Protein backbone atom coordinates (compact mmCIF):
# COMPACT_ATOMS: atom_id res chain seq x y z
CA UNK A 1 0.00 0.00 0.00
CA UNK A 2 1.41 3.38 -1.02
CA UNK A 3 0.23 6.55 0.75
CA UNK A 4 1.15 10.00 -0.56
CA UNK A 5 0.45 13.55 0.57
CA UNK A 6 0.99 17.15 -0.48
CA UNK A 7 4.19 17.07 -2.51
CA UNK A 8 6.03 19.58 -4.70
CA UNK A 9 3.42 19.35 -7.47
CA UNK A 10 0.63 20.56 -5.17
CA UNK A 11 2.84 23.28 -3.70
CA UNK A 12 3.75 24.47 -7.19
CA UNK A 13 0.08 24.54 -8.23
CA UNK A 14 -0.78 26.57 -5.14
CA UNK A 15 2.06 28.98 -5.91
CA UNK A 16 0.75 29.40 -9.47
CA UNK A 17 -2.66 30.21 -7.95
CA UNK A 18 -1.11 32.83 -5.67
CA UNK A 19 -1.33 30.74 -2.50
CA UNK A 20 1.29 29.33 -0.16
CA UNK A 21 0.98 26.63 2.50
CA UNK A 22 1.75 27.49 6.09
CA UNK A 23 2.77 24.68 8.45
CA UNK A 24 1.83 24.22 12.09
CA UNK A 25 3.07 21.32 14.24
CA UNK A 26 4.00 19.40 11.10
CA UNK A 27 0.58 19.86 9.49
CA UNK A 28 0.03 21.96 6.34
CA UNK A 29 -2.73 24.49 7.06
CA UNK A 30 -5.02 24.28 4.03
CA UNK A 31 -7.58 27.02 3.39
CA UNK A 32 -10.91 26.44 1.60
CA UNK A 33 -9.50 27.83 -1.65
CA UNK A 34 -6.26 25.88 -1.29
CA UNK A 35 -8.17 22.64 -0.67
CA UNK A 36 -9.74 22.81 -4.14
CA UNK A 37 -6.27 23.00 -5.70
CA UNK A 38 -4.79 20.36 -3.39
CA UNK A 39 -7.63 17.93 -4.07
CA UNK A 40 -7.35 18.34 -7.85
CA UNK A 41 -3.58 17.88 -7.94
CA UNK A 42 -3.32 15.23 -5.22
CA UNK A 43 -6.17 12.98 -6.35
CA UNK A 44 -5.61 13.66 -10.04
CA UNK A 45 -2.14 14.42 -11.34
CA UNK A 46 -0.03 13.01 -8.49
CA UNK A 47 -2.11 9.93 -7.73
CA UNK A 48 -2.57 8.88 -11.34
CA UNK A 49 1.09 9.61 -12.09
CA UNK A 50 2.16 7.19 -9.35
CA UNK A 51 -0.34 4.57 -10.54
CA UNK A 52 0.93 4.88 -14.10
CA UNK A 53 4.56 4.58 -12.99
CA UNK A 54 3.85 1.44 -10.97
CA UNK A 55 1.87 -0.14 -13.81
CA UNK A 56 4.66 0.60 -16.30
CA UNK A 57 7.09 -1.23 -14.00
CA UNK A 58 4.90 -4.33 -14.06
CA UNK A 59 2.77 -3.63 -11.01
CA UNK A 60 -1.00 -3.72 -10.81
CA UNK A 61 -1.80 -0.42 -9.12
CA UNK A 62 -5.11 1.28 -8.47
CA UNK A 63 -5.57 4.91 -7.45
CA UNK A 64 -7.75 5.81 -4.48
CA UNK A 65 -8.31 8.73 -2.17
CA UNK A 66 -9.37 8.65 1.46
CA UNK A 67 -12.94 9.56 0.52
CA UNK A 68 -13.43 6.42 -1.57
CA UNK A 69 -15.36 3.75 0.29
CA UNK A 70 -15.20 5.79 3.49
CA UNK A 71 -11.53 4.85 3.81
CA UNK A 72 -10.53 7.91 5.88
CA UNK A 73 -12.81 10.08 8.01
CA UNK A 74 -11.61 13.26 9.65
CA UNK A 75 -12.71 16.14 11.83
CA UNK A 76 -11.40 19.67 12.17
CA UNK A 77 -8.30 20.09 14.35
CA UNK A 78 -9.05 23.74 15.11
CA UNK A 79 -10.04 26.80 13.05
CA UNK A 80 -6.39 27.85 12.80
CA UNK A 81 -5.63 24.71 10.75
CA UNK A 82 -8.25 25.54 8.12
CA UNK A 83 -9.41 22.50 6.14
CA UNK A 84 -6.65 20.28 7.48
CA UNK A 85 -8.31 17.56 9.51
CA UNK A 86 -7.49 14.94 12.11
CA UNK A 87 -8.10 11.33 11.07
CA UNK A 88 -10.70 9.85 13.42
CA UNK A 89 -11.71 6.67 11.58
CA UNK A 90 -10.11 4.24 9.14
CA UNK A 91 -12.12 1.64 7.22
CA UNK A 92 -9.82 -0.70 5.29
CA UNK A 93 -12.56 -2.96 3.88
CA UNK A 94 -12.03 -1.66 0.35
CA UNK A 95 -8.23 -1.67 0.63
CA UNK A 96 -8.23 -5.30 1.79
CA UNK A 97 -10.51 -6.21 -1.12
CA UNK A 98 -8.08 -4.72 -3.63
CA UNK A 99 -5.09 -6.31 -1.89
CA UNK A 100 -6.79 -9.71 -2.09
CA UNK A 101 -7.20 -9.18 -5.83
CA UNK A 102 -3.50 -8.46 -6.25
CA UNK A 103 -3.71 -4.68 -6.62
CA UNK A 104 -1.33 -2.11 -5.12
CA UNK A 105 -3.58 0.58 -3.60
CA UNK A 106 -2.15 4.10 -4.08
CA UNK A 107 -3.91 6.42 -1.65
CA UNK A 108 -4.16 10.22 -1.81
CA UNK A 109 -4.65 11.75 1.62
CA UNK A 110 -7.92 13.60 1.53
CA UNK A 111 -10.67 12.40 3.87
CA UNK A 112 -14.42 12.70 4.17
CA UNK A 113 -15.73 14.95 6.93
CA UNK A 114 -17.02 13.24 10.05
CA UNK A 115 -17.97 16.31 12.09
CA UNK A 116 -20.65 17.98 9.98
CA UNK A 117 -18.46 21.05 9.49
CA UNK A 118 -16.98 20.13 6.11
CA UNK A 119 -17.40 17.45 3.45
CA UNK A 120 -13.71 17.05 2.74
CA UNK A 121 -10.48 17.54 4.68
CA UNK A 122 -6.84 17.38 3.74
CA UNK A 123 -5.05 15.09 6.19
CA UNK A 124 -1.42 14.46 7.05
CA UNK A 125 0.12 11.68 4.96
CA UNK A 126 2.27 10.72 7.96
CA UNK A 127 -0.80 10.27 10.17
CA UNK A 128 -2.82 8.53 7.45
CA UNK A 129 -0.02 6.08 6.64
CA UNK A 130 0.51 5.24 10.31
CA UNK A 131 -3.19 4.72 11.00
CA UNK A 132 -3.63 2.65 7.85
CA UNK A 133 -0.67 0.49 8.83
CA UNK A 134 -2.28 -0.17 12.21
CA UNK A 135 -5.71 -0.90 10.72
CA UNK A 136 -4.22 -3.27 8.13
CA UNK A 137 -2.08 -5.09 10.70
CA UNK A 138 0.98 -4.22 8.60
CA UNK A 139 4.33 -5.87 9.19
CA UNK A 140 6.27 -2.72 8.32
CA UNK A 141 5.67 1.01 7.94
CA UNK A 142 8.21 2.82 5.75
CA UNK A 143 8.40 6.62 5.79
CA UNK A 144 10.30 8.19 2.90
CA UNK A 145 12.13 11.47 3.38
CA UNK A 146 15.24 13.18 1.97
CA UNK A 147 18.89 12.86 2.96
CA UNK A 148 18.93 16.13 4.92
CA UNK A 149 16.07 14.93 7.14
CA UNK A 150 17.47 11.48 7.91
CA UNK A 151 18.51 10.68 11.49
CA UNK A 152 22.31 10.77 11.47
CA UNK A 153 24.56 8.12 13.00
CA UNK A 154 26.70 9.89 15.67
CA UNK A 155 29.53 7.43 14.99
CA UNK A 156 29.40 7.98 11.21
CA UNK A 157 27.73 11.33 10.41
CA UNK A 158 27.51 10.56 6.70
CA UNK A 159 25.40 7.46 7.39
CA UNK A 160 21.90 7.13 8.85
CA UNK A 161 21.36 5.97 12.41
CA UNK A 162 20.67 2.22 11.96
CA UNK A 163 18.32 1.85 14.93
CA UNK A 164 16.36 4.14 17.21
CA UNK A 165 14.83 2.85 20.43
CA UNK A 166 11.35 4.21 21.17
CA UNK A 167 12.40 5.25 24.67
CA UNK A 168 15.10 7.57 23.28
CA UNK A 169 12.81 9.53 20.97
CA UNK A 170 11.63 12.24 23.44
CA UNK A 171 15.18 13.15 24.49
CA UNK A 172 16.38 13.29 20.88
CA UNK A 173 13.50 15.60 19.99
CA UNK A 174 14.27 17.90 22.93
CA UNK A 175 17.97 18.04 22.02
CA UNK A 176 17.26 18.81 18.38
CA UNK A 177 18.99 15.64 17.17
CA UNK A 178 15.71 14.80 15.43
CA UNK A 179 15.15 17.73 13.06
CA UNK A 180 11.94 19.72 13.31
CA UNK A 181 10.80 18.50 9.92
CA UNK A 182 11.16 14.87 11.10
CA UNK A 183 9.41 15.19 14.47
CA UNK A 184 5.94 14.64 13.00
CA UNK A 185 7.05 11.59 10.98
CA UNK A 186 8.84 10.08 13.96
CA UNK A 187 5.92 10.61 16.34
CA UNK A 188 3.47 9.05 13.89
CA UNK A 189 5.74 6.03 13.44
CA UNK A 190 6.21 5.66 17.20
CA UNK A 191 2.44 5.60 17.65
CA UNK A 192 2.09 3.00 14.88
CA UNK A 193 4.66 0.68 16.46
CA UNK A 194 3.09 1.07 19.89
CA UNK A 195 -0.28 0.24 18.31
CA UNK A 196 0.86 -3.07 16.84
CA UNK A 197 2.80 -2.45 13.63
CA UNK A 198 5.81 -4.78 13.77
CA UNK A 199 8.41 -2.21 12.67
CA UNK A 200 8.79 1.30 11.26
CA UNK A 201 11.69 2.53 9.15
CA UNK A 202 12.79 5.91 7.79
CA UNK A 203 14.44 5.87 4.36
CA UNK A 204 16.10 8.45 2.14
CA UNK A 205 13.71 8.29 -0.78
CA UNK A 206 16.22 9.94 -3.12
CA UNK A 207 18.44 6.82 -3.04
CA UNK A 208 17.75 4.62 -6.10
CA UNK A 209 15.95 1.39 -5.14
CA UNK A 210 15.88 2.48 -1.47
CA UNK A 211 12.96 0.25 -0.50
CA UNK A 212 14.48 -2.83 -2.15
CA UNK A 213 17.84 -2.17 -0.50
CA UNK A 214 16.13 -1.87 2.88
CA UNK A 215 13.98 -4.97 2.51
CA UNK A 216 16.41 -7.30 0.74
CA UNK A 217 19.80 -6.49 2.27
CA UNK A 218 20.97 -7.76 5.66
CA UNK A 219 22.10 -4.37 6.96
CA UNK A 220 19.44 -2.13 5.38
CA UNK A 221 19.98 1.54 4.57
CA UNK A 222 17.55 3.34 6.87
CA UNK A 223 16.72 3.96 10.52
CA UNK A 224 14.48 1.37 12.17
CA UNK A 225 12.43 2.10 15.27
CA UNK A 226 12.84 -0.64 17.86
CA UNK A 227 11.16 -1.53 21.15
What spans do the regions from the language model cover?
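Nucleotide/pyrophosphate-binding catalytic subdomain
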Residues: 1-206, 213, 219, 227
Amino acid sequence: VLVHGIGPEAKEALKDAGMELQYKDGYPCVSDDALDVVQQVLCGKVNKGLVSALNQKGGKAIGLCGIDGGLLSAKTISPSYGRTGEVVKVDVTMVNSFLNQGYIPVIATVAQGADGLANVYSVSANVAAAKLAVALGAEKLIQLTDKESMLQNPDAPSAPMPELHLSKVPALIRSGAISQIMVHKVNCSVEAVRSGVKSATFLDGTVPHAILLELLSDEGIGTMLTH
